[in-house]
A protein has these predicted regions:
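Amphipathic repeat-derived elements
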Residues: 28-52, 163-192
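Short, charged/polar micro-motifs that form catalytic or ligand-binding hotspots
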Residues: 55, 115, 191
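Short coil/turn segments at the loop-to-beta-strand junctions that recur within blades
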Residues: 141-145, 191-196
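Internal, well-ordered alpha/beta segment that forms a basic, Gly-enriched binding/recognition surface
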Residues: 199-200
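Conserved small/polar residues in nucleotide/adenosyl-binding loops
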Residues: 203-205
């Protein structure tokens, strides 16, 4: 499905990294080997897929979700869909949207409290249907006033979603906590002297 778009393009625009320009739904899938019948569910991945075929940086393409559904030893479907934020050309945006909706939504995808969310580092997440269709920007019923990191963590004991947001203007850093049922229950500004990029990693010791 991918194709090289420029002869001397950077690696993220060529070969296996090259963007695909078509949204597919395939229900006749060839399986090589054997899918365990107890392996049921949907696997989804998110990544940058610039709709123009050009991108100045690996992280700057529009978000595209790829997904496959497995059930009873079969692969029922594969599909890929753009995350339809106002950044996408055919989104119907008219320029009056809240700036926090201006997300590429191209970095990560999570499932929490019955919601499937496509994430990036600076804006609100985007909620998707189980079939990968875009539902819209998600802000916890208006309670999330900042953006949301692309790398939240789920507490293994409480099921709460822990995340933060950082920005170029105050508040520079805000910590958030959502309950296991998906309610935003805590937002705390963390006092820092200025804007800084914060990137969370999980380290096992």
């Amino acid at each position: 499905m991918s194709e090289a778009v420029q002869k001397d393009a950077p690696f993220w625009l060529t070969g296996n990294f090259a963007p695909t320009f078509t949204e597919h739904t395939e229900t006749t899938l060839k399986v090589t080997g054997h899918i365990p019948p107890e392996l049921n569910g949907r696997y989804m991945r998110n990544g940058a897929n610039p709709e123009t075929g050009e991108s100045v940086h690996w992280f700057a393409g529009n978000g595209m979700i790829h997904g496959i559904e497995l059930a009873n030893g079969k692969a029922n479907w594969y599909r890929n869909r753009y995350v339809r934020s106002p950044i996408l050309k055919d989104s119907g945006a008219d320029g009056t949207e809240d700036p926090r909706t201006q997300s590429l939504a191209n970095t990560h995808i999570i499932s929490h409290a019955g919601k499937i969310l496509a994430l990036e580092e600076s804006h609100w997440p985007y909620e998707l249907s189980p079939e990968l269709e875009t539902i819209g920007a998600y802000n916890y019923n208006g309670k999330l006033e900042t953006g949301m990191t692309a790398h939240p963590k789920v507490c293994p004991e409480t099921g709460e979603l822990l995340f933060f947001a950082y920005g170029m203007v105050p508040p520079y850093l805000t910590y958030h906590r959502a309950s296991a049922t998906g309610e935003l229950i805590q937002s705390e500004v963390i006092d820092v002297k200025g804007a800084t990029m914060v990137h969370l990693s999980l380290i096992h010791i």
